[in-house]
C-alpha cells in the first residue's frame, strides 16, 4: 500500500511541469484532507449530540470541537506557510489558477459534507422520529449556514475568475 502511494506521488510530481506547482498541488491536497477530517469530526459530534443528548455532556462536545479547531488551525497555518512560499515562485496567472482550483475543491467538499449531514439526520428521523419542529429547525439551521458559506465561496470564485480574465487579456 505504501509503495503504491509513493509511486503515485512520484508519477504525479514527474508529470507536473513545474516543481513548485507540484508542491502546491500536494500541499493543497493535505489542506483539503485536514479540513475535511475536521469538518467530519465536528459534524459527527453535533449530530451525535442532537440524537443522543443523554449520552454526551456539553463539556465533552466543547472540548472535542475546540481540540479539533486548535489542531486544525495549527496545521493549516503550517501548511499555508508552505503554500505562501511556493506561491512566491509562480507567475500571477498560475497563482490565480491555483486559487481557483482550490476554491472549487473546497466548495465541492463542503457541499458533500452538508448533503451527507442532512441525509444522516433525515435517515435517523425516519428510524427514530423526533418532534417535527426540532427536525425542521435542525435542517433549517444547517441549510442556512451551508447557503451562506456557499455564497461566500461563489463570490470568491467570481473574483478569482475576473482576475484570471484580466490577466489573460494583458
Swiss-Prot record:
Localisation: Cell membrane
Transmembrane segments: 31-51, 58-78, 133-153
Disulfide bonds: none
Keyword terms: Cell membrane, Membrane, Transmembrane, Transmembrane helix
Membrane topology label: Multi-pass membrane protein
GO cellular component, one term: plasma membrane
InterPro entries associated with the record: DUF5418
Membership in a protein family: To M.jannaschii MJ0554 and MJ0587.
Protein name: Uncharacterized protein MJ0129
Protein species of origin: Methanocaldococcus jannaschii (strain ATCC 43067 / DSM 2661 / JAL-1 / JCM 10045 / NBRC 100440) (Methanococcus jannaschii)
Amino acid at each position: 500500500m505504501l509503495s503504491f502511494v509513493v509511486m503515485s506521488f512520484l508519477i504525479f510530481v514527474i508529470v507536473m511541469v513545474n516543481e513548485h506547482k507540484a508542491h502546491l498541488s500536494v500541499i493543497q491536497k493535505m489542506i483539503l484532507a485536514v479540513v475535511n477530517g475536521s469538518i467530519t469530526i465536528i459534524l459527527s459530534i453535533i449530530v451525535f449530540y442532537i440524537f443522543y443528548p443523554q449520552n454526551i455532556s456539553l463539556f465533552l462536545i466543547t472540548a472535542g470541537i475546540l481540540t479539533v479547531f486548535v489542531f486544525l488551525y495549527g496545521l493549516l497555518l503550517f501548511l499555508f506557510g508552505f503554500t505562501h512560499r511556493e506561491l512566491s515562485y509562480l507567475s500571477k496567472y498560475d497563482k490565480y489558477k491555483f486559487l481557483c482550483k482550490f476554491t472549487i475543491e473546497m466548495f465541492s467538499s463542503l457541499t458533500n459534507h452538508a448533503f451527507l449531514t442532512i441525509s444522516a439526520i433525515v435517515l435517523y428521523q425516519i428510524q427514530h422520529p423526533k418532534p417535527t419542529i426540532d427536525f425542521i429547525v435542525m435542517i433549517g439551521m444547517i441549510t442556512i449556514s451551508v447557503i451562506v458559506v456557499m455564497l461566500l465561496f461563489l463570490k470568491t470564485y467570481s473574483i478569482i475568475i475576473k482576475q484570471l480574465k484580466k490577466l489573460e487579456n494583458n
